[in-house]
C-alpha cells in the first residue's frame, strides 16, 4: 500500500513538472496569477523562475494531500518543538503551509479533543472520507476522547453559539487563518470582517474574526505550523492571551497583524511551501495597485513583455494578466499570436494598443 501511494505521488510530481498541453491549460489561470503574486510580494525573484516556483507550490500542495491519506507518516511526526497549552480550551491557529493537513492527525495522536472551523459547507463525500480517516487514526493511536471531529462552518446559523459550547466543553478549536473561507481558501476583497494589514511590504485585506473569538470567550491563541525538514515537524510559537485592558477592536487589529508577521517569517525560510501564492491576489488592494505606472522599457525589436504580463486560458478563451495591477483582460486571436511572436496579422490599431500598454516592447 505504501509503495502504491509513493508511486501515485511520483506520478503527480511528473505531471506537475512535465505537464502536457491539457495540464498547462488546466493550470493556466493559476499559473498566471501566481506569477503576478510572486512579482508583487517577492520582487527579488527572477521573472524566469516564476514558472518553476509555481510548480513547486503546486507540488507542495499535492504532497500535503498525500500526507493526509498516508497514515504511516503520523508514526514519525516530530513534536519536539510543540508546546501545547495547559488550558483545555484554546484556539490552535495555523496556515496553509507545508504539511498543514497533518495537524488534525497530530491532535488525534496526542489524544486531544478538538473541532475544526471552515468557512463554507463541506460536501457529504468529504465528510465521509474524513470520518473514515479519523477512525483509522483513532484506532491506531487509541484516542479515547473523540468519537468524531466536529466541523463548523462560519456560515452556519448559530455558528458562534456552537463555538462557545465546544470551547466550554474543553475542546481545542483548529483553524487555518490564511484564506479561511472554505476548502479553496479564497476570500473576497473588502468583505465582511476584513482588516487591512501589511504583508511583504504590501497592503492586503484579511479575515479578522479569529482574534475577536479569542477576546469574546477569553481563550488563548496558539500559533502552530507543520513543516518539512528531515521528516515532518510540528512547531508552536508563543501563545497569545486576550488583553482585556484594551478594546476588542484594538486587540483584533494587533493580533491579526502579529499572526501574519509570524507567517511571513515562516514563508521567508521556504517560500514555495505556502499555498497562499495561488490565491493571495484576492486579498490585494486593487485600487492602489491600479495606480501603478506602466513600465517604459524600450527595445529595438518588439517582443512580449513577460516581466509585466502573463497570458492564460480559461475555457478556450485567451486572457492577459498585468502582474503589477493584477487586472486581467480577454484578448483576441491576433493579440495571442502577437504574444507568441507572430505580429504580421495585427491591425495598426492593435499594434499601437499593444505598444502603448507595454504588452509589446
Language model region names:
Residues 115-122:
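Short internal beta-strands
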Residues 124-130, 233:
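Short, charged, surface-exposed secondary-structure boundary motifs
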Residues 141-151, 192-199:
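Short, basic, glycine/proline-bearing loop/turn elements
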Residues 329-361:
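Long, charge-rich, low-complexity alpha-helical segments
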Residues 309-338:
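Low-complexity, glycine/alanine/valine/leucine- and proline-rich hydrophobic stretches
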Residues 157-318, 348-356:
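Non-catalytic C-terminal accessory region of glycerolipid acyltransferases
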Residues 1-105, 113, 131-140:
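Membrane-anchoring hydrophobic helices of lipid-metabolizing enzymes
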Residues 148-160:
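Active-site glycine- and acidic-residue-rich loops that bind
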Amino acid at each position: 500500500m505504501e509503495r502504491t501511494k509513493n508511486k501515485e505521488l511520483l506520478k503527480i510530481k511528473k505531471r506537475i513538472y512535465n505537464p502536457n498541453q491539457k495540464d498547462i491549460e488546466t493550470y493556466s489561470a493559476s499559473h498566471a496569477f501566481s506569477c503576478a503574486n510572486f512579482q508583487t510580494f517577492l520582487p527579488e525573484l527572477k521573472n524566469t523562475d516564476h514558472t518553476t516556483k509555481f510548480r513547486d507550490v503546486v507540488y507542495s500542495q499535492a504532497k500535503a494531500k498525500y500526507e493526509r491519506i498516508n497514515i504511516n507518516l503520523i508514526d514519525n511526526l516530530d513534536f519536539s518543538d510543540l508546546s501545547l497549552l495547559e488550558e483545555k480550551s484554546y484556539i490552535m491557529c495555523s496556515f496553509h503551509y507545508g504539511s498543514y493537513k497533518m495537524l488534525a492527525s497530530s491532535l488525534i495522536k496526542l489524544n486531544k479533543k478538538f473541532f475544526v472551523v471552515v468557512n463554507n459547507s463541506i460536501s457529504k463525500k468529504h465528510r465521509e472520507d474524513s470520518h473514515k480517516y479519523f477512525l483509522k487514526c483513532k484506532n491506531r493511536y487509541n484516542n479515547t476522547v473523540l468519537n468524531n471531529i466536529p466541523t463548523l462552518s462560519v456560515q452556519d446559523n448559530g455558528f458562534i453559539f456552537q463555538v462557545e459550547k465546544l470551547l466550554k466543553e474543553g475542546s481545542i478549536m483548529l483553524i487555518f487563518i490564511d484564506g479561511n473561507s472554505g476548502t479553496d481558501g479564497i476570500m473576497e476583497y473588502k468583505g465582511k470582517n476584513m482588516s487591512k494589514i501589511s504583508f511583504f511590504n504590501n497592503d492586503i485585506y484579511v479575515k479578522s474574526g479569529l482574534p475577536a473569538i479569542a477576546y469574546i470567550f477569553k481563550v488563548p491563541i496558539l500559533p502552530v505550523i507543520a513543516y518539512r525538514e528531515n521528516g515532518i515537524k510540528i512547531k508552536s510559537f508563543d501563545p497569545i492571551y486576550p488583553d482585556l485592558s484594551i478594546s476588542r477592536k484594538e486587540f483584533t487589529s494587533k493580533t491579526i497583524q502579529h499572526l501574519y508577521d509570524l507567517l511571513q517569517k515562516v514563508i521567508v525560510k521556504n517560500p514555495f511551501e505556502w499555498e497562499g501564492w495561488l490565491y493571495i491576489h484576492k486579498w490585494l488592494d486593487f485600487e492602489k495597485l491600479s495606480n501603478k505606472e506602466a513600465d517604459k522599457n524600450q527595445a529595438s525589436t518588439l517582443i512580449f513583455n513577460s516581466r509585466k504580463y502573463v497570458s492564460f486560458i480559461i475555457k478556450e478563451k485567451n486572457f492577459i494578466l498585468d502582474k503589477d495591477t493584477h487586472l486581467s483582460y480577454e484578448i483576441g486571436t491576433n493579440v495571442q499570436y502577437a504574444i507568441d511572436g507572430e505580429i504580421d496579422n495585427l491591425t495598426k490599431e492593435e499594434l499601437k494598443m499593444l505598444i502603448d500598454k507595454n504588452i509589446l516592447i
